Regions:
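Class I S-adenosyl-L-methionine-dependent methyltransferase catalytic core
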Residues: 1-251
Length: 251
């Protein structure tokens, strides 16, 4: 009888509230190859900045299954390579992504059958929505196809102003109670610390959103910190091996 019971237990469908990724406030990201996007990444030879894309499966899955599970329409102003759209599609959620990079649009279509719109989120018609899932460009850390992206801004404050403009346009079309999931990172370059996470929080507060949850996105297990450790010790700061997913709610 125990064997029969075990067999039945083994074939039972997963409950509706089953989560593939454990919902904890620190999520360790597994290795991700970049074939078809930028080739393989060797973290022994490159800075940790190279690991900022593609978007982590664990985070996309958590947002789709947990934070945005009740959203009727989720938008994405920086749709990227298609990972977020793929997660929403797995959960049968309506998703509309916009991106300026023809390369990213093509990759999303071919690899994930996610059909994002080639458009500039600074000017595109934004639909009414109750969810947003995105990861903005990290200013000039990576250069994308196309000449008009935010990565082409020559000054940090110009980038922040353009980023603010995009979020403001989308927030103006967000329904009351809308959920916004935004992943950001901080970094150093030429002795300057760039605090994109904090700047995002300031923008969202101004737009009438409040924090709902935060998840530390840890890349410690896949980052080879030894290449950056000597400089960090010498200059007295930490090696950045994490990003932050911040979940906001519109009042």
């Amino acid at each position: 009888m125990n064997d029969t019971f075990d067999f039945i237990e083994g074939v039972k469908p997963k409950p509706k509230d089953h989560l593939e990724i454990l919902p904890v406030s620190v999520m360790e990201i597994g290795p991700m190859g970049k074939q078809g996007v930028r080739g393989d990444t060797d973290h022994n030879k490159q800075s940790s900045r190279s690991g900022y894309s593609p978007f982590p499966y664990e985070i996309a899955e958590t947002c789709a299954a947990l934070f945005l599970r009740d959203a009727k329409l989720t938008v994405d102003p920086f749709a990227g390579w298609g990972e977020r759209g793929d997660a929403m599609k797995r959960h049968n959620k309506e998703y509309r992504g916009f991106d300026l990079s023809p390369e990213a649009i093509e990759n999303a279509s071919k690899k994930y059958e996610v059909h994002n719109t080639l458009a500039d989120s600074r000017t595109v018609d934004v639909p009414s929505h109750d969810g947003l899932l995105t990861c903005p460009p990290y200013w000039s850390l990576e250069k994308y196809a196309g000449d008009n992206g935010l990565d082409r801004c020559k000054e940090w404050e110009t980038f922040i102003s353009e980023y603010d403009h995009v979020l403001s346009r989308f927030a103006s079309m967000a329904e009351s109670g809308a959920t916004y999931c935004i992943m950001t990172g901080d970094w150093r370059d030429d002795g300057t610390y760039y605090d994109l996470t904090f700047r995002t929080e300031l923008i969202m507060h101004k737009l009438g959103f409040i924090p709902f949850d935060k998840v530390v996105v840890s890349r410690l297990g896949i980052s080879k910190v030894k290449i950056m450790l000597p400089q960090a010790k010498r200059l007295g700061y930490t090696v950045k091996v994490h990003e932050m997913l911040t979940v906001f709610k519109k009042l």
